[in-house]
UniProtKB/Swiss-Prot annotation:
Family according to the record: Belongs to the AIM36 family.
Keywords: Membrane, Mitochondrion, Transit peptide, Transmembrane, Transmembrane helix
Protein localization: Mitochondrion membrane
Name this protein carries in UniProt: Altered inheritance of mitochondria protein 36, mitochondrial
Gene Ontology cellular-component terms listed: mitochondrial membrane
Record's keyword annotation contains Zinc-finger: no
Membrane topology: Single-pass membrane protein
TM region positions: 54-70
Source domain of life: Eukaryota
Main location: mitochondrion
Span of the transit peptide along the chain: 1-36
Length: 268
């Protein structure tokens, strides 16, 4: 049995199929060695990743853009731009210019020498208004006192078909309550803030142009809300004094606003 197996193995070793297989096994190591011993291709060598010059170029462009942006911001900076202009100003002109930038110009500032007395609850107090005119006037004839009633201004605008504000007031009007102690008109939120201050300012300007002796003004039923009070003092003039007729009226938000700066007084 052993001899037969040995002879069978000998015949298989000398068979063509076995010889082909053994030759392939012997050749495989040399083929694999040649495969892994080849040098990298030239394209791999050339692809060295981002070059240093690329980073330098990006950095240079970024720096240039940054400098341009900073210079643009400096040109728009009031402190920087004004400093450049100072060489063309005299010292007095420069101080005046800066002061003008710090605050918005009022239509009637302190240099106008005019006084403005706000009376937000004047609608039902005609006798008190006459007393106030005598109180604030420097003349026995009271010819230096002008009276502006916001209720009358609104009605005048709404009844004037050519008014620049009439249509706007009509379309935003919510209610007209004649029994109100203050401004009888109320409007919705679409009405732009400051329109009543503009109406009062225009009326004051007209009155002063027609009667230059006027330098005391009673503003009746005005300011009619807090935004108008703030807008009036920003754009038109400072309120000299706000006058009410009883303690209950001091609870109004507009009155409280002026009370914080001690401008509220009670007139009996």
């Amino acid at each position: 049995m052993f001899r037969q197996t040995l002879r069978l193995g000998t015949r298989m070793r000398h068979s063509p199929k076995f010889l082909g297989t053994s030759q392939m096994v012997e050749q495989f190591p040399s083929i694999a060695a040649r495969k892994y011993s080849n040098h990298p291709s030239s394209s791999f060598n050339n692809d060295g990743g981002p070059k240093v010059r690329h980073f330098l170029f990006v950095g240079l462009v970024g720096t240039m853009l940054f400098v341009l942006v900073v210079n643009k911001i400096n040109e728009q900076d009031p402190k920087t731009s004004l400093a450049k202009k100072k060489n063309t100003y005299s010292e007095q002109e420069w101080e005046s210019y800066v002061a003008g930038l710090k605050r918005k110009k009022q239509r009637f500032d302190s240099s106008s020498n005019k006084e403005f007395y706000a009376v937000p609850f004047a609608n039902k107090n005609p006798k008190q208004i006459e007393n106030l005119k005598r109180k604030v006037s420097k003349s026995s004839s009271q010819e230096d006192v002008g009276v502006v009633d916001i209720n009358e201004l609104i009605a005048k605008q709404m009844n004037n078909s050519e008014s620049a504000y009439g249509l706007l007031l009509k379309t935003t009007l919510v209610e007209n309550d004649p029994s109100s102690q203050s401004c009888t008109y109320s409007f919705n939120w679409n009405l732009a803030k400051g329109i009543f201050s503009k109406l009062v300012c225009d009326e004051l300007t007209r009155m002063i142009n027609e009667s230059p002796q006027l330098d005391r003004f009673l503003l009746l039923n005005f300011p009619n809300n807090l935004p108008e009070a703030i807008k009036f003092e920003q754009d038109v003039a400072n309120i000299t004094e706000l006058i009410v007729f009883n303690e209950e009226q001091k609870e109004d938000v507009v009155v409280k606003y002026f009370d914080t700066v001690d401008k509220v007084s009670i007139s009996k």
